[in-house]
Amino acid sequence: MKVLILAAGLGKRMKSKYPKVVHKILGKPMINWVVDLGKAFGEVGVVVGHKADIVKSYLPEDVKTYLQEPQLGTGHAVMCARDFISENEDLLVLYGDVPLLSKETINKLKKEHEEQKNQVTVLTFVTDNPAGYGRIIRENGKVRIVEDKDATEEEKKIKEVNSGIYIFSGKFVLENLDKLSNNNAQGEYYLTDLVGMAERSSTVILEDIVEVSGVNDRIQLAQLETIAKQRILEKLMLSGVTIVDPNSTFIGPDVEIGMDTIIYPFTIIEGYTKIGEDCEVGPYSHIVDSNIGNEVKVIRSEVEKSVIENKVSVGPFSRLREGTVLKEKVKIGNFVETKKTTVGKNSKAQHLTYLGDATIGEDVNVGAGTITCNYDGYKKYPTYIGDGAFIGSNSSLVAPVNIGKGAITGAGSVITEDVPNDALALGRARQIIKEGWAKKKREELKNADHKE
């Protein structure tokens, strides 16, 4: 089956300079929710129009795009993607601003379509307030759709309405697409007219109409985010994850969390993040696109595009940036920042430290205030710290530099040269003591004050 997503609309009511379909729900653009759904069923194509280049920038490379310019209705959108349609495959039509449709619903639609050997199968729903929706009319075993403005008084009483989601026979679409007419008040080509041409058609009635709820403004965007968040959190809790306060916790649709992990309030977990079992995350933590092992603590910290192995402690107030890898039992503490850095097993940097472009061995102690000076204004340089090294507090390691295994740097040192294994490196001025100098200085200052 091929999947065609219609995403060319302007979205005026969003009041935005960005296309409607790139606005996010739980950190993920709506169009990507729909693309991921579509990929579960086959090759995906997207019809773009308004600010097409922006929409394209959000799409995976393997998704084909088709330009609809100008936008002359849903039927016209499918016409613009004629080259995508195959007469040997069915065509599922979805919408870029309908993000909560489920695989289960599409499977039901697909099953009905295949079992009945339909030319078109329509996803419908029943509502007590059908105003504005196309009504479903059944005649002689066929289905047609009457738009609200064209419905008779009797037809307006019908409560089963069109969701806009269809599966077509590709052959049927190619044979009948050119028969669509724009002879209507809007001067547009409607996909609903194609439904009426089918000799073999039926419907699947959707029970949960939230699945086909679209987004037209930011109020509806917020409403769908609330619903999506609730469903994701409930699924996690039913799988063995403790969410202390669901109202203040935000977890994206592509996040995986293991059982017996506890998520504390005011935590945001987004992107393709995987968290293992028996972890504690939060409060006030933000994790994006990261892989976290078992028995890990992330407290009041930021983690982005990082890998954290088992039994690691992060925070409070740590920032792990892209390319960070923390091996087992590492401790990263207060106000420590890392980027493109690997920290070996059992090593720790617990206070006021920056580690960038660094490779740190096992059992290393990085003292408070340590900085890897990795940038000269033009280029980044690496720092290597061997197993068992001890980096004294307030050390500045000027890269490129290699600290050997078991080496020690004295507190307050500026290290500009490689340090051999098991050596002590001191890069600071020698301390000078002048006996009685402070007392003498105070007396001088006191006498000067009296003279004034």
Swiss-Prot record:
Residues 219-239 are annotated as: Linker. GO terms for biological process: cell morphogenesis; cell wall organization; lipid A biosynthetic process; peptidoglycan biosynthetic process; regulation of cell shape; UDP-N-acetylglucosamine biosynthetic process. Its main location: cytoplasm. It holds the Pfam family NTP_transf_3. Pathway: Nucleotide-sugar biosynthesis; UDP-N-acetyl-alpha-D-glucosamine biosynthesis; N-acetyl-alpha-D-glucosamine 1-phosphate from alpha-D-glucosamine 6-phosphate (route II): step 2/2; Nucleotide-sugar biosynthesis; UDP-N-acetyl-alpha-D-glucosamine biosynthesis; UDP-N-acetyl-alpha-D-glucosamine from N-acetyl-alpha-D-glucosamine 1-phosphate: step 1/1; Bacterial outer membrane biogenesis; LPS lipid A biosynthesis. Binds 1 Mg(2+) ion per subunit. Its cofactor is Mg(2+). InterPro entries: Bifunctional_GlmU, GlmU-like, GlmU/GlgC-like_hexapep, GlmU_C_LbH, Hexapep, MobA-like_NTP_Trfase, Nucleotide-diphossugar_trans, Trimer_LpxA-like_sf. UDP-N-acetyl-alpha-D-glucosamine binds at residues 6-9, 20, 68, 73-74, 95-97, 134, 147, 162, 216, 321, 339, 354, 365. Mg(2+) binds at residues 97, 216. Homotrimer. This is Bifunctional protein GlmU.
